[in-house]
A protein has these predicted regions:
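Conserved cytochrome P450 K-helix E-x-x-R motif and the immediately C-terminal K′/meander segment
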Residues: 312, 316-389, 408
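N-terminal membrane-proximal hinge/A-helix region immediately C-terminal to the signal-anchor transmembrane segment
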Residues: 1-80, 92
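Conserved cytochrome P450 K-helix/beta-meander segment immediately N-terminal to the heme-binding cysteine loop
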Residues: 395, 401-433
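Cytochrome P450 heme-thiolate monooxygenase catalytic core
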Residues: 100-282, 298-314
C-alpha cells in the first residue's frame, strides 16, 4: 500500500500497471466521482471480468478448508455455483429481507434486556460481558461482540435455516474469529505461527466446516419424520430440510453434480462469511462514529445532530413506539415496525443514513478483490487535465479492484480530509459503484439493522476503569465470596457505583479503536465498552397489537 501511495503522489496518470510473477496488474490511482468515472466504466464491463482460478482455489483451500480432492469436482461445475448463488440468494433478496425485518421487529426491543442473570439474557448479551450500570435502565457491554451476535441472529436463519443457527451456538463467534485472522488463514500460514489469535481462528474454521458438513448430511439424507399415530394430518418433526432456503436450493445443485459434503460446506461457509464479514463491521463502525459525532461539541461541526437526523429520516418507514402496558408494574418494552417496502426504498429517501454507511465503507474498506479480463476493454479518463485520454486494458491482464478503491478512498484530491469520518460526506456526492451482485442485499441488511438500533436505543461511551477500579471490584467480589447477590442488591450496588463515578467526575469519552484488516471491511483491534439505554419519549402506539415472542 505504501508503494502504491507513493506512485499516486508522484504520477499524473490515473491508471498504472505493475508486473507480479509475470502477470500484468492494472491499478486505478486517481478518479472522479462522476457517473463517467473510471470505476463506473469498469463496472459497465462486468461481463468481461472474472475471478481467475488460482486465487479462487487458494482462498477456498486455505480460508475455507476445501480438500484438494474436491478441486476437480468443484471446477467441473464451472460457473453454475456463482450463477445459482445470484439467482437463489441475491435475486431473491426481497423475501429474505422480509423474513429478516420480521426477526428484527421481534429482537430489536431485546437488544439489551437489562437482566443481570446470564440465564435470562439473550444470546447476544451473553457474549458481550453485560453489566448493569444504572439499575435496570442502563447496561454496559462490549459493542462489537453484541453487534456481531445480534446481526448473525437476524441475517443467517433465512439463508441457512433456523434449526441450524439455533443448534450451533458458536456460529457467530466462530465467524468473527475466522474473520479476525482471515488473511493469515487465507495465506495458508501454519496455525502455530507467532500471530496472536491464529490458533483460535484455525480452531473456529475446523468447527465451522464440521458443522456445515453435518448440516449438508442432514439436508441430503433427512431423518425420517415422526408422524403421530392419532393424527395423520400432522407432519411431525420439522427440520431445515423441510424449509426452502437458498442453501437447500444450492444443495440440490450440489447433489446433481455429486459434490462431496465437505466441499459443499466450504462453498457455503465462503458465502455466509462474505455477507457477515461486511455487514457486521459496517454496522459497528457506523454506530460508533454516528454516536460519537452526535456527542457534545462534535455535533456542532456537522450543524445537525447525526442521530437526530437519522431518527427523523427513517421514522416514516420504521417507526418506534411505546405499546400500552398490561399492568402499571410491568411496562411493555418499546416496539418497532418496518414498512413492507423498506428493502425497496431508494437511497434518496434516507440520504443521511446511506451517507453514514458509505462513509464507513470508504474509511474501512480493505477488499483485495482482483479480476482478470476476458477481452480487451477501452477506458477513457473523465479528467481532461491529464495527458493520456484513453487506455486499452489487455485481455488476460488483471484489475486490482479492491486496491484501486482503497487508494481512491484515501485520496485527499477526491475526498478532503480523507482520514476524518464525515457523516454527511455522501449526501451530495455519489459513492463509487460496486461490481458485486451481493452489494444491494448487504446494503439492505446494514440499513435495516442500523435503522432499528437508532430508533430504539441510545449508546454512550463507558467511563474507562483504572487499575484501582478493577482492584476494588476484585476485592469486593472476594469479600462477597460465594454469596450470590439478588437482582435488587446488584441494582442498588450499580446505582452506588454510578453516583460515585459522577461525584469523582468520571465521564466516558469516545475512543475510536485502531482498525485491523478483515476479509473486506476492517475490524476493531479491541472492543469498545459502551453504555446502552432505551430511547426515551417514544410516541404511544400499538394499541390492539400483541407482541409475539
Amino acid at each position: 500500500m505504501n508503494c502504491t501511495n507513493c506512485c499516486s503522489d508522484s504520477t499524473f496518470e490515473s491508471i498504472v500497471a505493475y508486473n507480479a510473477s509475470g502477470v500484468k496488474h492494472n491499478v486505478v490511482l486517481n478518479d472522479t466521482l462522476s457517473e463517467h468515472s473510471i470505476m463506473a466504466q469498469i463496472t459497465k464491463h462486468a461481463d468481461q471480468l472474472y475471478l481467475p482460478r488460482p486465487p479462487r482455489w487458494a482462498l477456498l483451500h486455505n480460508a475455507f478448508s476445501m480438500s484438494g480432492n474436491a478441486e476437480k469436482p468443484y471446477f467441473d461445475i464451472g460457473v453454475a455455483i456463482p450463477k445459482a448463488v445470484v439467482a437463489d440468494l441475491y435475486d431473491e433478496m426481497l423475501p429474505l429481507m422480509s423474513s429478516t425485518l420480521h426477526t428484527l421487529s421481534e429482537s430489536l426491543p431485546d437488544f439489551v434486556t437489562f437482566n443481570s442473570s446470564i440465564v435470562d439474557q439473550m444470546q447476544w448479551e451473553r457474549v458481550a460481558d453485560v453489566e448493569l450500570s444504572d439499575g435496570t435502565s442502563e447496561a454496559e457491554c462490549n459493542l462489537f461482540a453484541l453487534v456481531n451476535e445480534f446481526c448473525c441472529n437476524a441475517i443467517l436463519p433465512p439463508i441457512i435455516g433456523a434449526q441450524f443457527t439455533e443448534s450451533y451456538q458458536l456460529l457467530a463467534t466462530d465467524l468473527a474469529a475466522l474473520n479476525s485472522r482471515y488473511w493469515a488463514v487465507a495465506l495458508g500460514l501454519p496455525r502455530l505461527s507467532p500471530i496472536p489469535g491464529l490458533p483460535g481462528a484455525a480452531l473456529s474454521q475446523k468447527r465451522l466446516i464440521h458443522n456445515f458438513t453435518r448440516m449438508f448430511g442432514e439436508l441430503t439424507n433427512p431423518a425420517v419424520r415422526r408422524v403421530p399415530d392419532d393424527d395423520e394430518s400432522v407432519s411431525g418433526d420439522e427440520t431445515d430440510a423441510d424449509v426452502v432456503t437458498p442453501v437447500t436450493k444450492l444443495n440440490k445443485l450440489f447433489t446433481e453434480h455429486d459434490l462431496p459434503l465437505a466441499a459443499r460446506a466450504s462453498v457455503t461457509l465462503q458465502l455466509v462469511h462474505d455477507i457477515v464479514a461486511e455487514v457486521v463491521p459496517l454496522v459497528f463502525w457506523t454506530l460508533l462514529h454516528v454516536y460519537a459525532s452526535s456527542d457534545g461539541s462534535a455535533a456542532k461541526a456537522f450543524e445537525v445532530i447525526p442521530t437526530g437526523k437519522i431518527i427523523a429520516e427513517t421514522k416514516p418507514w420504521a417507526p418506534a413506539f411505546q405499546p400500552p402496558s398490561i399492568h402499571p408494574s410491568f411496562p411493555s418494552p418499546p416496539a418497532i415496525t418496518f414498512d413492507p417496502t423498506f428493502s425497496e426504498l431508494p437511497a434518496d429517501l434516507m440520504p443521511y443514513l446511506h451517507s453514514c454507511i458509505n462513509e464507513s465503507r470508504r474509511l474501512y474498506s480493505c477488499s483485495a478483490l482482483t479480476y482478470q479480463l476476458m477481452a480487451p476493454i477501452t477506458i477513457y479518463d473523465p479528467n481532461s487535465t491529464v495527458k493520456q485520454d484513453t487506455w486499452i486494458l489487455d485481455a488476460d491482464s488483471y484489475i486490482d479492484i479492491g486496491l484501486s478503491q482503497s487508494l481512491i478512498n484515501s485520496s485527499p484530491a477526491i475526498f478532503p480530509e480523507p482520514k476524518v469520518y464525515r457523516p454527511d460526506r455522501f449526501t451530495t456526492i455519489p459513492y463509487p459503484p460496486s461490481t458485486s451482485p451481493s452489494h444491494p442485499y448487504k446494503s439492505a441488511l446494514t440499513l435495516a439493522i442500523l435503522t432499528g438500533i437508532f430508533q430504539l436505543w441510545e449508546v454512550a461511551p463507558a467511563p474507562k476503569k483504572s487499575f484501582f477500579d478493577h482492584m476494588n471490584e476484585a476485592r469486593e467480589e472476594a469479600q462477597i465470596g460465594a454469596a450470590a447477590l439478588s437482582n435488587e442488591q446488584k441494582a442498588a450496588k450499580n446505582v452506588q457505583l454510578k453516583e460515585k463515578r459522577e461525584k469523582e467526575g468520571k465521564v466516558g469519552k469516545w475512543v475510536i479503536p485502531k482498525a485491523i484488516d478483515g476479509a473486506s471491511v476492517k475490524l476493531p483491534k479491541a472492543d469498545v465498552r459502551v453504555r446502552i439505554r432505551r430511547r426515551e419519549g417514544l410516541p404511544a402506539g400499538g394499541f390492539g397489537m400483541r407482541r409475539v415472542g
